[in-house]
Each structure stands twice: as structure tokens, then as C-alpha cells.
Amino acid sequence: MMMKSLICLSLILLPLVSVVEGLGGGGGLGSRKPIKNVSDPDVVAVAKYAIEEHNKESKEKLVFVKVVEGTTQVVSGTKYDLKIAAKDGGGKIKNYEAVVVEKLWLHSKSLESFKAL
């Protein structure tokens, strides 16, 4: 009887484990995932936030052009590692790397780093 119970339990739990692993995109909890749609309004909003915060801190006047590429990682919130194209004060388009952590439940974002590439 005990063996039948273990077999039944295994048959129930194994598919559940597979589903949970599948939801993680194959990378596991905390792994980086490429952003498939860099034009997604939420991604663009995070990139614009990064530029606005950088402009405040540095007194530069960068203007957002587009998100070139990026990854997300679930940490204590969502960590965005973005490559952003922006125009500098002279009108030249350059690429920048920004790291932003967004905590939706707290309605907060923080710019962790921003640098020219």
C-alpha cells in the first residue's frame, strides 16, 4: 500500500515540477532573460526613467532614442540591464548601459548604474 501511495504521489508531483521549471523560461529563478520586445512600452518607460535620473544627477541633457537590447532578472523586484541609444547635447547618438531595479508593489524604481559604452 505504501508503494502505491509513493507511485501516485510521484505521478502527481513530477508533472508539477516540470510545469514550474517551464514557467521560469528554462533559466531558473534569478537567471537573466533577454528582452524579446525592446519596444514594449514598459521597457521604454524604464529606459526613459534611467535617462531622466542620469540627467538629474549629471546635469547632462541626454535625449532618449531607443532601447537597443536588454535583459531582465527577477531579484528583489525586476532588474533591467539595458543598452540605450540616446542623443547627447551635440546631437550625436551614443549607446549607454543602464541598470534599473523596479519594485512594482512599492511603486518604485531606482537607477543603479548608468555609463557610456
UniProtKB/Swiss-Prot annotation:
One of its GO terms (molecular function) is cysteine-type endopeptidase inhibitor activity. SMART domains: CY. The record marks G30 as: Reactive site. It is found in: Secreted. Residues 30-115 form the Cystatin domain. One of its GO terms (cellular component) is vacuole. CDD domains: CY. Glycans are attached at N37. A motif (Secondary area of contact) lies at residues 73-77. SUPFAM superfamilies: Cystatin/monellin. It comes from the Eukaryota. Belongs to the cystatin family. Phytocystatin subfamily. PANTHER family: CYSTEINE PROTEINASE INHIBITOR 4, CYSTEINE PROTEINASE INHIBITOR 5. This is Cysteine proteinase inhibitor 4. It comes from Arabidopsis thaliana (Mouse-ear cress).
